[in-house]
Regions:
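Positively charged n-region of N-terminal signal peptides that target proteins for export
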Residues: 1-4
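Bacterial N-terminal signal peptides
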Residues: 6-16
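Hydrophobic alpha-helical segments
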Residues: 16-17, 117
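Sec/Tat signal peptide C-region and signal peptidase I cleavage site
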Residues: 17-23
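A compositional/structural signature for long, glycine/proline-rich flexible linkers
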Residues: 23-471
Length: 471
């Protein structure tokens, strides 16, 4: 009898997990699946709360806002979830004295340079593949998008340098955002629209609390505590209609994971869980170790993860398990919806120049000094923002101050022409308020942005100065 049950246990064990190879396959496939499709989890669930074929944005940006990772307060936002599968949309952009930029992305956050220009008012028709542009109204500029489901983001600058003086155009930028309209072509022509076509209209402005859902924190906690639940949610996102077309290699990965996961048993779940958690470790490690000699993290290829970046219509996803796939996911984890390097350069620091993690426990804080020749070359502006350690969101502070920028009113230069930014919990004695960036009591990180990079920032050779601990 004992021998019978020993044999039965062996047979059942082999049926549940026939070989070590199957366990390894579950682990590696899950690891590659998560690193490949990680951005889709974010965009699938974020866009389910977004306005479809209509621009929208928060009434203001404060630490309550958690919707997008590494949000900043130096521009005014308007965003639309585009679904062109039923009807093109007519986008009307008014004139404004404020500078603004346009960003168009797919659900992976791959960037598509459409013909929709920055700083150019007009009426544009956005249409997807399969639509005949000859059917569009005359005197409207047609803009073809490579796929039907994309995200459109406008960023309007609050300040503008005019004759050497920074002009506050916050009100004008907000008016510009509110006056943009997006409607289906049928409504534009005064026709009855098919059922299910979003009506569109002017930009909708929502209270910031609407954007409080912390997607990054949710993803991080799910992977750490319930990776199987995260995998099920990721499967739902991957199978969503807005997922861009897959290359044969990526499609095989998706189908192979689905088959393994569907036939797995409870005894096999640890391999899937371990694969998901290892993928998350790879994603975070890639970002946090992508540093230069002064401990600033910087990527020069943001948005260009596909095999054919010069032709988005022929774009295919990076190979499963490749460094590009991991990099794309790491950008989603730490600086979602980032511009490409030509539009904006990003430098992110979690450590000071001595390789010690940034921590605001010591009240003396830190200083970042740009020599006159080390200021980021820019045609728009540069800014420095402090963030919380895990969610990468704005730091709550009594001053309601979240950045120091080249346009900050009353920003003071040192006698030699350099600029020092002081990072501390409270305004240090003798420091001009404009040069102070509030930080939390405990770990934090800072991001330097250059909108419209020039010279050595644009060519990728610029390295920001060290962050120094004040002693």
């Amino acid at each position: 009898v004992k021998r019978f049950f020993e044999c039965l246990f062996l047979v059942l064990s082999l049926a549940v997990f026939p070989t070590h190879v199957k366990a390894q396959d579950a682990f590696t496939t899950t690891r590659d699946y998560v690193t490949q499709f990680y951005p889709l989890w974010f965009t699938y669930y974020q866009t389910s709360f977004g306005t479809v074929n209509q621009l929208s944005g928060p009434n203001r940006i404060t630490p309550i806002y958690h919707y997008v990772v590494a949000i900043n307060d130096d521009t005014i936002y308007a965003t639309s979830v585009l679904d062109l599968s039923m009807e093109p949309v007519i986008l009307t952009i008014p004139s404004t004295p404020a500078n603004y930029s346009v960003l168009t992305l797919d659900r992976y956050n791959d960037i598509f340079h459409s013909a929709l220009p920055d700083n150019t008012p007009g009426t544009y028709a956005l249409y997807g593949p399969g639509f005949d542009p000859d059917r569009l109204p005359s005197k409207i500029t047609p803009i073809r998008l490579p796929i039907n489901y994309m995200t459109l983001i406008f960023r309007a600058d609050k300040f503008k340098l005019v004759d050497g003086v920074e002009q506050d155009l916050t009100s004008e930028a907000d008016t510009f955002r509110r006056n943009m309209t997006m409607v289906p072509v049928c409504a534009y022509l005064g026709q009855n629209c098919p059922a299910g076509v979003p009506p569109g209209g002017p930009t909708r402005i929502f209270p910031e609390i609407v954007f409080a859902l912390p997607f990054k924190a949710i993803a991080d906690k799910l992977i750490a505590r319930d990776p199987i639940a995260f995998l099920r949610q990721l499967q739902t996102a991957v199978k969503g209609p807005a997922t861009p077309p897959m290359s044969p290699e990526v499609k095989r990965l998706s189908e192979h994971f689905d088959a393994l996961f569907a036939t797995s048993t409870l005894n096999q779940r640890p391999e899937f869980a371990s694969g998901a958690q290892t993928a998350h470790e790879l994603i975070t490690e890639d970002y946090l170790t992508h540093i230069d000699g002064t401990n600033w993290i910087s990527y020069k290829n943001i948005g260009y993860w596909c095999h054919n970046p010069d032709n988005f219509h022929a774009c295919t996803n990076p190979d499963p398990g490749s460094s590009l796939a991991i990099q794309r996911s790491s950008i989603t984890e730490y600086i979602q919806y980032a511009n490409d390097h030509e539009a904006a350069a990003y430098f992110h620091a979690f450590k000071d120049g001595d390789d010690i993690p940034l921590d605001g426990t010591d009240p003396d804080g830190y200083v970042l000094t740009f020599s006159r020749k080390k200021l980021p070359a820019t045609k728009r502006f540069w800014s420095l923002t402090a963030y919380t350690p895990d969610a990468i969101e704005l730091v709550p502070n009594s001053a309601d101050k979240y950045l120091v920028a080249s346009y900050t009113p009353d920003l003071k230069k040192n006698a030699d022409g350099s600029i020092s930014i002081y990072m501390a919990r409270k305004l240090p004695p003798g420091v001009p308020p404009a040069n102070w960036l509030p930080i939390p009591r405990g770990p934090f990180n800072v991001m330097l942005r250059d909108y419209g990079p020039l010279e050595n920032v644009l060519d990728g050779t610029y390295v920001p100065p060290r962050i120094e601990k004040i002693r």
